[in-house]
Amino acid sequence: MRLFVGLGNPGAKYQGNRHNIGFMVIDEIARRHGFSPWRRRFQGETADGVLDGERITLLKPLTYMNESGRAVQDAASFYKIGQNEIAVFHDEIELPPAKVRVKVGGGIAGHNGLRSISAHIGNDYLRVRLGVGHPGAKELVHNHVLGDFAKSERPWVEALCEIAADNAGLIAKGKDASFANKVHLAMQAKGFYDNDKQAKGGERDK
């Protein structure tokens, strides 16, 4: 089995924040693939289902972003799974809006949710990095990620969540590069990317 973690903050106040795009994608996976109803456990909410023959548990930590690792550690301990069976979907300010990159391990780029997870379980889990853009100055980052997506951004946000959810089975199968490529091509076909920009994915897909 695999654990898919979406990062965000709980509550209506944060629901539309850029920081919550991980929650949004995980919610869409549950909706589009007929997962079980959400229930409270592991200091979060979970839903269970199957993607491309792989058993998946979705987890949305309710600890607030900075303590996400506590929920991930609880779930990983319960299921007795290692870092290689965990995928974390999170907002990424170092990527342009709507861009997606997939990688195993690496730095945390100042992301407090990733910092907490790495502190609790180690650093070698899969990250599905969902671009939300950079506001241009370090002092603006806090308000940027805790701000809601603008009305003009909603079309690509909705499209990205749907396309990522439709192709999530590739992540379940360990085909990270194929996932990134499929998302890129589908978003490009909808007109959200420039044609001259190439998507780059993970390295595990052979």
Swiss-Prot record:
<comment type="function">
    <text>Catalyzes the release of premature peptidyl moieties from peptidyl-tRNA molecules trapped in stalled 50S ribosomal subunits, and thus maintains levels of free tRNAs and 50S ribosomes.</text>
</comment>
<protein>
    <recommendedName>
        <fullName>Peptidyl-tRNA hydrolase</fullName>
        <ecNumber>3.1.1.29</ecNumber>
    </recommendedName>
</protein>
<dbReference type="GO" id="GO:0000049">
    <property type="term" value="F:tRNA binding"/>
</dbReference>
<keyword id="KW-0378">Hydrolase</keyword>
<feature type="binding site">
    <location>
        <position position="112"/>
    </location>
    <ligand>
        <name>tRNA</name>
    </ligand>
</feature>
<comment type="similarity">
    <text>Belongs to the PTH family.</text>
</comment>
<keyword id="KW-0963">Cytoplasm</keyword>
<dbReference type="GO" id="GO:0005737">
    <property type="term" value="C:cytoplasm"/>
</dbReference>
<feature type="site" description="Stabilizes the basic form of H active site to accept a proton">
    <location>
        <position position="91"/>
    </location>
</feature>
<feature type="active site" description="Proton acceptor">
    <location>
        <position position="19"/>
    </location>
</feature>
<dbReference type="GO" id="GO:0072344">
    <property type="term" value="P:rescue of stalled ribosome"/>
</dbReference>
<comment type="function">
    <text>Hydrolyzes ribosome-free peptidyl-tRNAs (with 1 or more amino acids incorporated), which drop off the ribosome during protein synthesis, or as a result of ribosome stalling.</text>
</comment>
<dbReference type="InterPro" id="IPR018171">
    <property type="entry name" value="Pept_tRNA_hydro_CS"/>
</dbReference>
<dbReference type="GO" id="GO:0004045">
    <property type="term" value="F:peptidyl-tRNA hydrolase activity"/>
</dbReference>
<dbReference type="GO" id="GO:0006515">
    <property type="term" value="P:protein quality control for misfolded or incompletely synthesized proteins"/>
</dbReference>
<dbReference type="InterPro" id="IPR001328">
    <property type="entry name" value="Pept_tRNA_hydro"/>
</dbReference>
<feature type="binding site">
    <location>
        <position position="14"/>
    </location>
    <ligand>
        <name>tRNA</name>
    </ligand>
</feature>
<comment type="subunit">
    <text>Monomer.</text>
</comment>
<feature type="site" description="Discriminates between blocked and unblocked aminoacyl-tRNA">
    <location>
        <position position="9"/>
    </location>
</feature>
<dbReference type="InterPro" id="IPR036416">
    <property type="entry name" value="Pept_tRNA_hydro_sf"/>
</dbReference>
<keyword id="KW-0820">tRNA-binding</keyword>
<dbReference type="Pfam" id="PF01195">
    <property type="entry name" value="Pept_tRNA_hydro"/>
</dbReference>
<feature type="binding site">
    <location>
        <position position="66"/>
    </location>
    <ligand>
        <name>tRNA</name>
    </ligand>
</feature>
<feature type="binding site">
    <location>
        <position position="64"/>
    </location>
    <ligand>
        <name>tRNA</name>
    </ligand>
</feature>
<keyword id="KW-0694">RNA-binding</keyword>
